[in-house]
Structure formats: C-alpha cells, structure tokens
C-alpha cells in the first residue's frame, strides 16, 4: 500500500507541495465501500419496518404474541394467542418494577388492557373493583374478575400488590408507573455513596426546587463561553495571562467560600438543632468538608501544573493571535459544532428507532416460561452487529467531516497571501471540496478509528460482565488492554486530524497525507510540545474558568438552602453542562490551533523567505519564533538546543 511503500516515500520527499492548486478525488474505493455500507444500513431499517415490527413497537404486544389494539391471528402451539384486542390498547405489566438491567428485559407477564390504573390498588378487591368499573382486567385472560379474590386462582396471574398508579407513555401505549420510587433501586445504584433513602429523596427534591437556578446557570455558562470566544478573537495577546489570573482567582475563591461555609456550619450551636434534624446537620457538615477538601486538592494540582508550564506559556501568544485573526475572517466557524451535533442527533435518532424496530422483528418463538419472544434466525440475526458497527463508523464519519471542513477553511485562510482574496464563504467552499473530492478520505480515516474503538468496547463489555468473577491477573490484563487501545485511539485521532489537514492542503489520499503529517510532526517534536500542547492546556484553562465561574455562581445562589447535602446534584448538573458548552466552543479553537501549527510547519519546511519562496505565515508568528530562538541562545547551552528545534527548517538547494 501507499502507506508503507519505500517508493512512495521517495516520491513524497521529492514532491512539491502546492497548496490549494491541484485538486483531485481521493480514496474513491473507500467512498464506494462506505456507500455500500450505508445501503446495508438502509436495508436493515426497511427490513425491520416491513416485517411488522413497527406495529409491535408502537402498539405493544403481550406475553402471548398478541398486538394490542387490533385483532390478532392464532399462533401455532401458543396458548392465549389470536385474541381480539381491539378495545385493549395498552400494555400492562404485572410487575413493572421488576427490571432485568443485564438482559435489558422486563421480567414480568405483559397483558393488553383497556385502561391503565390511575390510582394505586392496594388489594385484590381494589383490582376487582377497577375491572368492574373501568372494564379493564388486570389479571390473566383465563381469570374472570369475579375470581380475582380467590387466592388459588390469582396466585401468579394477577399483578403484584400494591399495583402502582400508572399512565400510558405517549405514542407507545405502555402503562408506566408515575411514582419514581418504583425505580429507586436504580437511582441508588447510580448514587453509590448514598445508603439512606431519606438522603436520596432530599437530593431529588433539591434538584426539583432548584430547577430555575439550574436553568439560569446553564444559560450563564453559554453566555460566558460566547464572551470568552469574543475575548479570544480580539485580545489574544493578553488572553493567556488573563486566563491564568482568573483561573487562580476562581479556584481560590471557590475553595475559600467552601471552607468559610464549613467553618460557619461547624461553629453553629448544636443545641439549637432539634433532634430530628441532628443527622441532617451532620451530613451537611460532612458534605461541606468533602467539597472543601476536593476543591483544595484540585487547586493545588492546578497551581503545580501552571508553575511547571509558566516558562512556556508565552510560546502560545503568537499562535493565539493568528487563531484570533482566523475567527475574525471566519466567524461562522464558531457554530460548526452545532451543525455537527445536529447531524449526530438526527443519525442517533434514526439509529435508535431502527434498533427498537429490530428488537421486535422476527418470528414468534416460545421461551422457557411459555411466553412469546420475537427472534431473528439464520444469517439475518447478525444484523445487530452490523447495526452497532454502523453506529460507530457513521458517527466517526460525521465528526471527521467536521474536522475536514474546519481544516479546509483554515488552510484556505493560511495559504491565501492577500486575505482580501478569500472566498466569500470559505466554510461553504471547504464543504464543497469535501463533498466533491475527499469523502473517501474521511470514510477511510473514520473506519480506522472504528477498527480500534470496537475491540476496546468489546473488552469493556467483557470486563463489566466478569466484574467480581475474574482473578486479579485477568483483571489487570483486561484493564491494560483497554488502556492501550484508548491511547492508540487518541493517537490515531490526532494523526487523522493532521492527515485531513494535509489532504486539504495538497489533495493527497489518506495514507500519503497521514505519512506526510507524521513525518512533519516528528521533525517538529519540540514545537508540538512547546506550542501545540501548551495552547491546548490554555484552552483547557478556559474551560476550567467557565466551569469554576458557573460553579461559584451556583454556590452563591444555592447558599439560601441550608441543606448543603442537596447541592451535589444541582452543582454536578450545572458544572457538567458548563464544561460541555465550553468544550463545544473551545474545541473548534483547539482544532484551528492544530491546523495552523501544521500549516506553519509545512510553510517553514518548504519555504525560506527568498524571492519565489516567500512564507505564507503571519508576520507576528514568524517574528515570535525568531525572537524566541534568539532568547534561547542567550539563555545558554540548553536553550540553544531548543533554539535549533525552533528555527525554521530551510530547504537545501
């Protein structure tokens, strides 16, 4: 293949880079393969709908294979099948709270009923009365309502008491309990540090009472992210130091407020607390102590990292300045993640609907309990695996399209000497080039990520299934393999992004672009460490700033609630949303910095500033590199070594 051929490598070393000049289609076989794969995904969707799965999914069916709300045909050798359920439109489970999370099934008999019980039914007499008044029989079809109170008849064929109040799920005709206590054990499994139901209820009530504050803080994080993007565009030279100071103040402020609240709570007289509230007060004090210690540890670690990186922080200023100019000329880049997210949501909605259709597709089969399940037999049973691979590959393909679009727009900006000659819409021009020439390259790059991601997910599933059963050696090996595959996936993702940039520059196929990008990154190893990594770290500080600011605002707004234990869920929700919003905005800035760095490295490798070989880069960036090289030479021997790495690699003539 071209990825590893020595002849190809020799041609690459002699090949001239001609940015944006020659454009040709790349990796056409991979585009054809991807199109065929998508046709297969469409076949799975059509098959699942055409085989009647849509009616079983939407209307629901009972444990005997009868679809609710219609007349059914008799199934061979299956009792209670072939019933007329025209007036029984809802699925009712005799024990709706008995869920099997491992096998993703409801371990309960399902019946078609005329109405869901809107009030709790505590006795069999209540169940009988409900059937007589509403005409909705909640026991098995073989038992008459008059026989509900007979223990010998109703045992195992009537709902588990008490029957929780339920309501039909919109559009899906299933009776679902309206009381969340039915699912309390699953919430407790997620919140493992809580063993007292009263604490769990206080946490949930804290979220409900603070929903307006949570919504306001989420909007605040969105506004702060947009403000930070504006600051990055217009004051990039001082942005690094502003971020550093604000992060220090934000982390110190949040930590100080938590310790102040802890001291205030500890000094409060316990005699004034009624005995019933004493345990709650102790929980509050313990929660505040945990919050304060966690914030202190985070602040100390953050300070140590900033102390180590302080000498190299200045290296990012010039690169941030150029990136700010990119957003001035290409402001719509900020909204690129929203279009990508919208495309992902549409695909995921399609994928989930098809998955639900597949779950009710196939022939009726009687299981060990005598109930009906729908299973696909023969080669079609492997459609599940095909569908899962499609989820990963197409999702990675959509993300790769975003990377190629951003790379194409930034490359156009960088290699256009006169910025007044930029296309009217560089982003749309980049999308046009992607669709016309480079969809095959994107398909190949996303497939490589899929090849690494699938084994890692399989190992993670095996590890979760064997939890508590495997020995220490096997557990260590599994975790090591998962960790190695995760690292490989991250490295390949970074290489893929740079390969897309190389393709956007010179219109080469994926293998050639990946090889060229890898060689350039290796030749500029210290540049990658000193500029690219530090830039990413400063963007991370921007995310931390938004999270800390939003969290601090949340602490001040939630301070009126003296039950500090209930802070945990609202603060976690707000901080997670703030981080996701900040990541959504700043990830594009990070991507622009990465693309600019590769363009800069290629520019310095193939141009020397002489007539006919002028640099494309911004003068500010080149002046910064030269000044840094001189400063490092004056610093001594070690600095001279770094300077040799930082100076432009002039091409020998």
UniProtKB/Swiss-Prot annotation:
Cytoplasmic compartment spans: 2-29, 233-237, 309-314, 359-379, 558-565
Membrane topology reported for the UniProt record: Multi-pass membrane protein
Keyword Lipoprotein recorded: yes
Tissues in which the protein is found: Specifically abundant in skeletal muscle (at protein level).
Catalytic activity: choline(out) + n H(+)(in) = choline(in) + n H(+)(out); ethanolamine(out) + n H(+)(in) = ethanolamine(in) + n H(+)(out)
Mitochondrial intermembrane face residues: 51-211, 259-287, 336-337, 401-536, 587-653
Subcellular location(s) of the protein: Cell membrane; Mitochondrion outer membrane
InterPro entries recorded: Choline_transptr-like (IPR007603)
Entry superkingdom: Eukaryota
Keywords: Antiport, Cell membrane, Lipoprotein, Membrane, Mitochondrion, Mitochondrion outer membrane, Myristate, Phosphoprotein, Transmembrane, Transmembrane helix, Transport
Transmembrane segments: 30-50, 212-232, 238-258, 288-308, 315-335, 338-358, 380-400, 537-557, 566-586
Biological process, per Gene Ontology: choline transport; ethanolamine transport; transmembrane transport
Cross-referenced Pfam families: Choline_transpo
Cellular component terms (Gene Ontology): membrane; mitochondrial outer membrane; plasma membrane
Covalent lipid adducts (N-myristoyl glycine), residues: 2
GO molecular function terms noted in the UniProt entry: antiporter activity; choline transmembrane transporter activity; ethanolamine transmembrane transporter activity
Function noted in UniProt: Choline/H+ antiporter. Also acts as a high-affinity ethanolamine/H+ antiporter, regulating the supply of extracellular ethanolamine (Etn) for the CDP-Etn pathway, redistribute intracellular Etn and balance the CDP-Cho and CDP-Etn arms of the Kennedy pathway. Involved in membrane synthesis and myelin production.
Family: Belongs to the CTL (choline transporter-like) family.
Protein name: Choline transporter-like protein 1
Gene name linked to the record: Slc44a1
């Amino acid at each position: 293949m071209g990825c590893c051929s020595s002849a190809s490598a020799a041609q690459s070393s002699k090949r001239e880079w001609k940015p944006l000049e020659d454009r040709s289609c790349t990796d056409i076989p991979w585009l054809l393969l991807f199109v065929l794969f998508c046709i297969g995904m469409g076949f799975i969707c059509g098959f699942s709908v055409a085989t009647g799965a849509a009616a079983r999914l939407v209307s629901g069916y009972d444990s005997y294979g009868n679809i609710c709300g219609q007349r059914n045909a008799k199934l061979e050798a299956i009792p209670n099948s072939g019933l007329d359920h025209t007036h029984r439109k809802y699925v009712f489970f005799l024990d709706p709270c008995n869920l099997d999370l491992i096998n993703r099934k409801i371990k309960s008999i399902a019946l078609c009923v005329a109405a869901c019980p809107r009030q709790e039914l505590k006795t069999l007499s209540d169940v009988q009365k409900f059937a007589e008044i509403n005409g909705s029989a909640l026991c098995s079809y073989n038992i008459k309502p008059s026989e509900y109170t007979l223990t010998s008849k109703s045992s195992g064929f009537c709902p588990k008491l008490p029957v929780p109040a339920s309501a039909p799920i919109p559009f899906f005709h299933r009776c679902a309990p309206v009381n969340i206590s039915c699912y309390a054990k699953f919430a407790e499994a997620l919140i493992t540090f809580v063993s007292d139901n009263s604490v769990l209820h206080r946490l949930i009530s804290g979220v409900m009472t603070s929903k307006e504050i949570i919504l306001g803080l989420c909007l605040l994080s969105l506004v702060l992210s947009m403000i930070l993007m504006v600051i990055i565009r217009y004051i990039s030279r001082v942005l690094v130091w502003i971020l550093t100071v604000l992060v220090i103040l934000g982390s110190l402020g949040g930590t100080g407020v938590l310790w102040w609240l802890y001291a205030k709570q500890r000094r409060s007289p316990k005699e004034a607390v009624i005995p019933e509230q004493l345990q709650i007060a102790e929980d509050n004090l313990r929660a505040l102590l945990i919050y304060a210690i966690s914030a202190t540890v985070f602040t100390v670690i953050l300070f140590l990292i900033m102390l180590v990186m302080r000498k190299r922080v200045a290296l990012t200023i010039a690169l941030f300045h150029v990136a700010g100019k990119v957003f001035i000329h290409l402001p719509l880049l900020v909204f690129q993640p929203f279009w990508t997210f919208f495309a992902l949501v549409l695909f995921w909605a399609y994928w989930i609907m098809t998955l639900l259709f597949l779950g009710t597709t196939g022939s009726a089969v009687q299981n060990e309990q005598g109930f009906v399940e729908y299973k696909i037999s023969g080669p079609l049973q492997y459609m599940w695996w095909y569908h899962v691979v499609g989820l990963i590959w197409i999702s990675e393909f959509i993300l790769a399209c975003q990377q190629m679009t951003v790379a194409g727009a930034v490359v156009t900006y960088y290699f256009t000497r006169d910025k007044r000659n930029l296309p009217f819409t560089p982003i749309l021009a980049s999308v046009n080039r992607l669709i016309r020439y480079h969809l095959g390259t994107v398909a190949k790059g996303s497939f490589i990520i899929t090849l690494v991601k699938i084994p890692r997910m399989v190992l993670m599933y095996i590890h979760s299934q064997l939890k508590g059963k495997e020995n220490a050696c096997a557990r260590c090996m599994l975790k090591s393999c998962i960790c190695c595959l995760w690292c490989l996936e991250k490295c390949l993702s970074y290489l893929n992004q740079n390969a897309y940039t190389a393709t956007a520059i010179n219109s080469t196929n994926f293998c050639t672009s990946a090889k060229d990008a890898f060689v350039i990154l290796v030749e500029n190893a210290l540049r990658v460490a000193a500029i690219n990594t530090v830039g990413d770290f400063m963007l991370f500080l921007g995310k931390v700033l938004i999270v800390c600011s939003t969290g601090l605002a949340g602490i001040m707004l939630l301070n009126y609630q003296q039950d500090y234990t209930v802070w945990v869920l609202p603060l976690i929700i707000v901080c997670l949303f703030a981080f996701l919003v900040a990541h959504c905005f700043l990830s594009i800035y990070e991507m622009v910095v990465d693309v600019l760095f590769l363009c800069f490295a290629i520019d310095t490798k193939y141009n020397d500033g002489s007539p006919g070989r002028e640099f494309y880069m911004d003068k500010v960036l080149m002046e910064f590199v030269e000044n840094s090289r001189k400063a490092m030479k004056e610093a001594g021997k070690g600095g001279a070594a770094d300077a040799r790495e930082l100076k432009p690699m002039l091409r020998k003539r």
